[in-house]
Amino acid sequence: MSEHTFGQPRALGVGAFGEVGNRVFVLQITGDLETLTLKAEKTQLAALAEWLGSVVKAGGRPGHLPDDFAVTLPYDIAFVIGDIAVAHDEDENVIDVRITSPDESDETSFTLTPEVAGGLAIAITRAVEAGRPPCPLCG
């Protein structure tokens, strides 16, 4: 089993690459010693964003939300995301994220402050919605 533990990452990236309908979604975690890029389904990232957003919202408006969540290129996919487990540690006021591959042979974990979680939720939402055509009624 390959395990990657980051604590609080130095950087996070999220992006979608390719043509609409065939896009590859990635989540990138950078620590002091390594950068790990994971392939995700759009629905997995959307669910993560929704959960992070709800936790941040429940805790009240956090401080400054970072907005730099660009993926560092080029990248190599370390593994495909199977399950994402998220827990809010209320005592420490952090969000713990654990991601495993479908066969559970690979795993990574990292911790987010409410500010980083809020910024990441926004970045994920932007990446997920970027390929959608504009609504003909909304413009």
PLM feature segments, named:
Residues 1-139:
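Positively charged, low-complexity terminal tracts
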